[in-house]
Amino acid sequence: AWSGNFDNDPIRRGKWIREHLLAGTIPDVPLDVDAVVPEHRQQSLRQRLQVTRDEYCWSCHQKMDPLGFPFEQFDDFGRFRKTEMVGDLLSIFPERHVDAETVALDTRGSVSDSGDEKLEGDVKNVVELVHKLGDSTRVRQSFVRHAFRYWLGRNETLDDSPTLIAADQAYVKQGGSMKAMIASLLSSDSFLYRKTN
């Protein structure tokens, strides 16, 4: 679920989507930034994360936060939910929360700066986001690239372009077949004639 031990983490979820599905990059947190979410437990997590809207932080957070917020529909254990508990949350078990109340979840988000115009725009919830990502050529190609890196044990080079194109075409021609993509990768020159330095 890509969350912390005791709370959701839409920032981490959004960063994962940006880097692994959209093939983007997010720089590390600068050393002079205290990257801690405020503990104002009377506010929702989205409200507490407003601190990331400061100009200094927002240049990176605008690429992550809107991608992670739709996943607020799931708690830190991955359980579906419609509301968020606020107040004194002393336990990870909702039935044991003391002086807690619930607020409606805001699962709106957006995709921006993705490099794929069809992917750009607002989403109401995680289902819309997943459908957008699933229909994206950029996400598919990023998926193929990650499969290449896994199966070949290295990053791709310019010489690997024919292998990546063939694997992508095999995946598409077989209706999204992982088996066809892996067969294409493992029968490619990039795999069969690897350098052993």
What are the residue ranges of the model-derived segments?
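Active-site substrate-binding loop specific to GH73 endo-beta-N-acetylglucosaminidase modules
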Residues: A1-R138, V144-R149, S161-G176, I182-N197
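Core structural elements
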Residues: W151-N155
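Short, surface-exposed acidic
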Residues: L158
